[in-house]
Amino acid sequence: MAGACVFSLKLFESPDALLRSALINDSKQLSAESRESQFTVLESLQAEGLIDFAVAFGSVAEICERNILGATRLAMQRAIEQLAQQADGWSLPQVAAADPLFKAASEVKVIVDGRPLKSFPYAHEGVIKGDGKSLSIAMASIAAKVTRDREMLRLAEKYPVYGFAQHMGYGTAAHRAALIKHCLLYTSD
């Protein structure tokens, strides 16, 4: 109900990266403290050149205009484009409109948590409950959650009456009540 974040990850083949990421799990299964700790591991792996990742947001205005899935697709596309700019020589082939939504596993360049996305310009494969099945998706879920939570804590300081520090903008009863009480229906922050 407040904010959106998507994360994209490129994992380089590295036994060290895999070993050091052994505690990474679905972000929903980790405490906030554990997520922060694992995000620090991801940042270290990136600094050492073992993985590369990008975080991108879908804005409140984009959610209102396109719905949450449309804004998420847009943020995913932005993250992929950021990765392409960061990594020399790395790119994803775009899918023509007539192509199927996803390619054979050997050709897949992007995996997403959930079902394959309609109207997404990159070859991809959906993995249901992927954050519990794929290290890359689990890493992505941690980075997305940590980044989003940090943004919500920033907004909590700016708008304390909404209780973002407690519910992080998710649709809890307390969040809905604060929205109704304080009449905040839309902001572009």
Feature locations, PLM:
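RNase H-like, Mg2+-dependent phosphodiesterase core
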Residues: 1-188
